[in-house]
Regions:
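Eukaryotic low-complexity, non-globular regulatory regions
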Residues: 8-10
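DNA-binding patch around the recognition helix
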Residues: 14, 19-59, 94-141
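Short, well-structured alpha-helical interface segments that form or flank functional binding sites
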Residues: 60, 77, 89-92
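Short amphipathic alpha-helical interface segments
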Residues: 60-73
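Short acidic, hydrophobic short linear motifs in intrinsically disordered regions
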Residues: 73-83
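Short amphipathic alpha-helical interaction segments
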Residues: 84-96
Length: 144
């Protein structure tokens, strides 16, 4: 059987594999450690800085989540961290916040508290107030 060049990419040009059989970790496919210790550290940090969840009402969750994301900056919060901090249905809370805030969802692979690899876990980063709303507010003389 004829073999085309580069059909077997086990040499240069293919994905490098580590000893465990998975792809070698680079900056683009880094796996985030989301162990119990790391999640506890995030929750403790939020509490120390006054942005921990105070109660479970939806309105409080939205306002506190916005403050927590604002405090965390580019580090944001992923789904596991947010759930451990007390936010129920993290994606729903983020969707509600997106009505007035610009929030970016990044996807990352994590080793969860269960010790298993979870691919494509969302990490939410607050970018600021939505610019399209600012323009609409200014266009109506502040009445919106």
């Amino acid at each position: 059987m004829f073999k085309r060049p580069n059909e077997d990419a086990s040499t240069a040009g293919g994905v490098h594999v580590d000893q465990a059989g998975g792809p070698e970790l680079t900056g683009q496919n880094r796996i985030f450690d989301c162990s119990r210790e790391n999640i506890t550290a995030v929750c403790d940090e939020l509490a120390r800085n006054g942005v921990a969840l105070r109660n479970a009402s939806g309105a409080t969750q939205r306002e506190t989540l916005r403050m927590a994301l604002q405090y965390r900056g580019a580090r944001g919060l992923n789904t596991y961290e947010g759930t451990a901090a007390g936010y129920m249905r993290m994606a729903t809370r983020v969707k509600e916040l997106k009505e007035t805030w610009d929030i970016h969802a990044l996807r990352e692979d994590v080793i969860g508290p269960d010790g298993l690899l979870h691919k494509g876990v969302a990490r939410y980063v607050l970018l600021g107030r939505r610019q399209d709303l600012q323009a609409r507010i200014q266009g109506t003389g502040g009445l919106l």
